[in-house]
UniProtKB/Swiss-Prot annotation:
This is Protein P. Terminal protein domain (TP) is hepadnavirus-specific. Spacer domain is highly variable and separates the TP and RT domains. Polymerase/reverse-transcriptase domain (RT) and ribonuclease H domain (RH) are similar to retrovirus reverse transcriptase/RNase H. The polymerase/reverse transcriptase (RT) and ribonuclease H (RH) domains are structured in five subdomains: finger, palm, thumb, connection and RNase H. Within the palm subdomain, the 'primer grip' region is thought to be involved in the positioning of the primer terminus for accommodating the incoming nucleotide. The RH domain stabilizes the association of RT with primer-template. Residues 178-346 are annotated as: Spacer. It holds the Pfam family DNA_pol_viral_C. It catalyses: DNA(n) + a 2'-deoxyribonucleoside 5'-triphosphate = DNA(n+1) + diphosphate; Endonucleolytic cleavage to 5'-phosphomonoester. The record marks 63 as: Priming of reverse-transcription by covalently linking the first nucleotide of the (-)DNA. Activated by host HSP70 and HSP40 in vitro to be able to bind the epsilon loop of the pgRNA. Because deletion of the RNase H region renders the protein partly chaperone-independent, the chaperones may be needed indirectly to relieve occlusion of the RNA-binding site by this domain. Inhibited by several reverse-transcriptase inhibitors: Lamivudine, Adefovir and Entecavir. Residues 224-243, 253-316 are annotated as: Disordered. One of its GO terms (biological process) is DNA replication. It comes from the Viruses. Belongs to the hepadnaviridae P protein family.
Length: 843
């Protein structure tokens, strides 16, 4: 007869009318009983012949791809001008006095952040924007391109101008100013009727131009002239020390050469102003040029700047038609849906490319991307705005993966010990937190995103994947991309983007100037940054508890009035550092804080209501006696595992599911096991804050017997059959808890101390979790354990009772720096463990 739910509860000793614990509990460690129960509950029968179920409620399993939904009405979020102050350490020190070594180290890590993987795979530009929405390809292309443009304008991205130069918007940092052009010297030389450009800019690392002027350039370094050198100092080489110039045969056009206006510009201003002046010069120089893409013989996409035959060419003569978009202007419409109709809507489509306010030199950057991008909803609650997803997963996969640094995240018990108090709470919203942290320009070649331009994108998606060579093709080739779909999409997009359609149809390569969300290093850097800032805030405002996890920052104070005044001061302090807060999203929680998916109050911690609701819905839709695909089980365990610490039996109750996931088999829920889990998750118990105290109850065991020391009394007992030592120690701890009711027990067994009961026999693990719930353990060495003698059957011998103090654990999260640590005379090493003591105790 199958095991009923009531019998199963009695078996697990979850009901009060069970027999004496010393007899009942060791029985649960019996292998035979565990096997019989598993068979009764159908837990071990993983090989099933019935087809697997691949969907349970919202959880999808194998062979199902969740198709993201494209929203044609997506708005691109606006980004404030985020500029984290470079002298953040000095500013903090002015505010709070000298910083600890730990805080300084963390803040130096992000000023600027560095990211240099061993190996970077470069992907063709076609893979820049992922074809996630084939039905809305063109719309997705322009929305993504607009998002990237917005990020560039906000100073979050660099734009690759040439192989060795990039431009950006926003305020430059000192490490960027060192790389700016000190001086710009243009010289035009005319010989043998061959007019060519000879650019001698000290910042843009263009390849040597073509023509007779090359000879004079051979003496120059690849890096160009330095600001302090003479305006035409020929013989000296620059920083690189190597004199290498690539000479192109005169017949070929030069790629990536910086174009110059006629005449000579010699600007001796400071680097910043020269940089601004230069960008203005570059704009005029570029205004009559157009950039396009062309497939070179090696199949690489190369930027081609078509230089007009005369440098003094008047701008009124119109653009040179190498631009795919503008070529339609001079062509006859091929049909009613020809793009010519759209191009003729406007007289002035604006420039082909835009250039940033500042220019810097960068390491050699190919015309490639290292990760694809696509758009999704900003979050489940906000589907009107889009979010850019950047896929830099190449750095986390395969043989070339980078192992990211580990950092301390408080576990549930530590979090409860830290934050469970009768304080009043509010949480701050840091807007675009990742985009606060600047990246060194040398990391740019590893973090490239971009697009190959509209024609290539459309050609790749069209059924006849023609290799469009629109540089030397006929006009007919140009019209190959005309189609009704493209025409209708562009007409609708014209209402949104206007003349920007032209700009966005061009290829572009962008590198990250601030840390991207998709980089494996980013969470670590963000955690270091916010935890250092909170540490400074706690010292500056001793009566305030500031705590952060990633971009979630919470402030706690004794009263609401106190909290409000602290909020004003702290907000001003953070704004002075350049940290952008979103005042509309500041949440005031009262006395129960919502943080990291938990509700934390003076009574302890529970999961948030929406998670409890999700679990209830999940059980409602969970089928019985039907094999469920292990991928669905994995998602199920993710949800149930989050709330497991709040149930009677905890994680051990989920062990059968873990086993099925590990063996990649289907799992069949029997009615009893489902009812058991259902009841477990319907009644959730808070995880309470641990209290410090003196330990006066000790437990110890040998494979054959157990012993307890409760105050001055001693007890002992024997097992019917010898047991593994860890099992025996766990049983002894359970007996100590049940007999004394103490919440503090001393043990010499590390497994019992760790409170992870998933490796024990299943039934015993479940029962022990319930008996020992809310118990804290203190380690006592075997030699000093007063329960050691009784466990060996010696009751007459009394070891002195130890007074073992217990301090609640806060993991590696230090909440308060009591004093500045004395500098040691040892060589400075980077520590990740916090040397600070936790002096703050929750009230």
């Amino acid at each position: 007869m199958p095991l009923s739910y009531q019998h199963f509860r009695k078996l697990l000793l979850l009901d009060d009318e069970a027999g004496p614990l010393e007899e009942e509990l060791p029985r649960l460690a019996d292998e035979g009983l565990n096997r019989r129960v598993a068979e009764d509950l159908n837990l071990g029968n993983l090989n099933v012949s019935i087809p697997w179920t691949h969907k349970v409620g919202n959880f999808t399993g194998l062979y199902s791809s969740t198709v993201p939904v494209f929203n044609p009405e997506w708005q691109t979020p606006s980004f404030p001008h985020i500029h984290l102050q470079e002298d953040i350490i000095n500013r903090c020190q002015q505010y709070v006095g000298p910083l600890t070594v730990n805080e300084k180290r963390r803040l130096k890590l992000i000023m600027p952040a560095r990211f240099y993987p061993n190996l970077t795979k470069y992907l063709p530009l076609d893979k820049g924007i992922k074809p996630y929405y084939p039905e809305h390809a063109v719309n997705h292309y322009f929305k993504t391109r607009h998002y990237l443009h917005t990020l560039w304008k906000a100073g979050i991205l660099y734009k690759r101008e040439t192989t060795r130069s990039a431009s950006f918007c926003g305020s430059p940092y000192s490490w960027e100013q060192e790389l700016q052009h000190g001086r710009l010297v243009f010289q035009t030389s005319t010989r043998h009727g061959d007019e060519s450009f000879c650019s001698q800019s000290s910042g843009i690392l263009s390849r040597s131009p073509v023509g007779p002027c090359v000879r004079s350039q051979l003496t120059q370094s690849r890096l160009g002239l330095q600001p302090q050198q003479g305006s035409l100092a020929r013989g000296k080489s620059g920083r690189s020390g190597s004199i290498r110039a690539r000479v192109h045969p005169t017949t070929r056009r030069s790629f990536g050469v910086e174009p110059a206006g006629s005449g000579r510009i010699d600007n001796r201003a400071s680097s910043t102003s020269s940089c601004l002046h230069q960008s203005a010069v570059r704009k005029t120089a570029y205004s009559h040029l157009s950039t396009s893409k062309r497939q070179s013989s090696s199949g690489h996409a190369v930027e081609l700047h078509n230089i007009p035959p005369s440098s003094a060419r008047p701008q009124s003569e119109g653009p040179i038609l190498s631009c795919w978009w503008l070529q339609f202007r001079n062509s006859k419409p091929c049909s009613d849906y020809c793009l010519t109709h759209i191009v003729n809507l406007l007289e002035d489509w604006g420039p082909c490319t835009e250039h940033g306010e500042h220019n810097i030199r960068i390491p050699r950057t190919p015309a490639r991307v290292t990760g694809g991008v696509f758009l999704v909803d900003k979050n489940p609650h906000n589907t009107t705005e889009s979010r850019l997803v950047v896929d830099f997963s190449q750095f986390s996969r395969g043989s070339t993966h980078v192992s990211w640094p580990k950092f301390a995240v408080p576990n549930l018990q530590s979090l409860t010990n830290l934050l469970s108090s009768n304080l009043s709470w509010l949480s701050l919203d840091v807007s675009a937190a990742f985009y606060h942290i600047p990246l060194h320009p040398a990391a740019m070649p590893h973090l490239l995103v971009g697009s190959s331009g509209l024609p290539r994108y459309v050609a790749r998606l069209s059924s006849t994947s023609r290799n469009i060579n629109y540089q030397h093709g006929t006009m007919q080739d140009l019209h190959d991309s005309c189609s009704r779909n493209l025409y209708v999409s562009l007409l609708l997009l014209y209402k949104t983007f206007g003349r920007k359609l032209h700009l966005y149809s061009h290829p572009i390569i962008l590198g990250f100037r601030k840390i991207p969300m998709g980089g494996g290093l980013s969470p670590f850097l963000l955690a270091q940054f916010t935890s250092a800032i909170c540490s400074v805030v706690r010292r500056a405002f001793p009566h305030c508890l500031a705590f952060s996890y990633m971009d979630d920052v919470v402030l706690g104070a004794k009263s609401v009035q106190h909290l409000e005044s602290l909020f004003t001061s702290i907000t001003n302090f953070l704004l002075s550092l350049g940290i952008h807060l979103n005042p509309n999203k500041t949440k005031r929680w009262g006395y129960s804080l919502n943080f990291m998916g938990y509700v934390i109050g003076c009574w302890g911690t529970l999961p948030q209501e929406h998670i409890v609701l999700k679990i209830k819905q999940c059980f409602r839709k969970l089928p019985v006696n039907r094999p469920i695909d292990w991928k669905v089980c994995q998602r199920l365990v993710g949800l149930l595992g989050f709330a497991a610490p709040f149930t009677q039996c905890g994680y051990p109750a989920l062990m059968p599911l873990y086993a099925c996931i590990q063996s990649k088999q289907a799992f069949t829920f029997s009615p009893t096991y489902k009812a058991f889990l259902c009841k477990q998750y319907l009644n959730l118990y808070p995880v309470a804050r641990q209290r410090s105290g003196l330990c006066q109850v000790f437990a110890d065991a040998t494979p054959t017997g157990w012993g307890l020391a409760i105050g001055h009394s001693r007890m002992r007992g024997t097992f019917v059959a010898p047991l593994p030592i860890h099992t025996a120690e766990l049983l002894a701890a359970c007996f100590a808890r049940r007999r004394s009711g103490a919440k503090l027990i001393g043990t010499d067994n590390s497994v019992v101390l760790s409170r992870k009961y998933t490796s024990f026999p299943w039934l015993l693990g479940c029962a022990a979790n319930w008996i020992l719930r809310g118990t804290s353990f203190v380690y006592v060495p075997s030699a000093l354990n007063p329960a050691d003698d009784p466990s060996r059957g010696r009751l007459g011998l009394y070891r002195p009772l130890l007074h073992l103090p217990f301090r609640p654990t806060t993991g590696r999260t230090s909440l308060y720096a009591v004093f500045l640590s004395v500098p040691s005379h040892l060589p400075v090493r980077v520590h990740f463990a916090s040397p600070l003591h936790v002096a703050w105790r929750p009230p």
